[in-house]
Amino acid sequence: TGYTGDLGYEIWLDAAHALEVWDALVAGGSAYGITPAGMLALDLARLEAGLMLIDVDYVSARKALVDSQKSSPYELGLAWTVDLRKEYFVGRRAHAEEAKRDAQWQFVGLEVDWNSLETLYADVGLAPQLPSAAWRASTPVYSATEQVGYATSGGWSPLLKKYIALAHLQGSSAAVGTQLEIEVTVEHRRKRAAACVVKKPFFDPERKRA
């Protein structure tokens, strides 16, 4: 299905055969380490894959209450979904105008610096406290003293052994390699940890193209 960012399939069948097919899949996959996964695990997998989630990482234009809540395909890295060669479609004129200029915002990947995080916790006598699941909250991102964007999803990747996040950043701060800071809460106090803009997806296995 692609939601995990890895090779996957959807199986559609009559409900009466669901248990039989499930048992067959589990039995056939046991030699390959097949394991059922719940939504918390899937949410981490989609984070590692750099996949955005509606109403978490972006707001639908149908639900946006103010213009600042809206995002265009160009700002979300989805310019490839807009075909301006088509003669007419709703919104074509606006898309054509936006395509002529650089997007004001970019949806990017962030990697939080482990040493920076470790230092913040060491200052209060603790080891880094890592989230057990992906978090979903608007979290400020800074360049020096200026807020230049906000992260929307993040968490510790057990696969990559890295603290990663997805974020909306102003175009001038969105280039891969840009050094920034992300807000973290350490013992109920707001701190800033160093973070770097990195290429999405975080995890991109060759096997998913099979």
PLM features per residue range, with description:
Residues T1-A210:
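Conserved, structured C-terminal
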